[in-house]
């Protein structure tokens, strides 16, 4: 099941809602990677999966890309549309779950982004998500994923122990109700390499705020390609 109610509730909390258009640093670094790969598509088509308020969509549109975004929260997608309209960007935002069939043609996009959005999908939704992302990417298209990392993350292991979800390596965030999946390197690779060639994978440590406290968390930064 989608977690539309949980995400909508969270986006309505003013402290959770990101109103700025500054992109996430990991998305900017991904663009640097693309340049090193000699990626030279003119006005590339970009699909921002779980786009939230459109921070990363805005960044790609600002640099000449034709962007589409999918987001389950009405509050978030409305703000994303407002920001795009103010800037004069024609970004195609749709209120949809990324765990369902995508409304796009085969091989439509050059780039797909998943910046910690698919973590809350169920296993059945994730299978659809991966099949659909593969379908709508062009051959040779790039897929950037930032996912929660289990390896070496004591906070993730504590959450699994105290607030376990019904599926492997999942937990339910207390006071929020959002489910999250954390990944070992082995599980991530075995799941994603069925669909994509993994070009680069690294573990990154940063801090996440929850219940007015900062927690050290690990993430996987992964660059992939549709071969």
Language-model region placement:
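Class I (Rossmann-like) S-adenosyl-L-methionine-dependent methyltransferase catalytic domain
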Residues: 1-44, 52-101, 125-128, 142-227
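A short glycine-rich, Lys/Arg-flanked "PGG" loop and its adjoining helix->strand segment in the class I
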Residues: 127-139
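Residues immediately N-terminal to the Walker A/P-loop in ABC ATPase nucleotide-binding domains
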Residues: 42, 105, 138
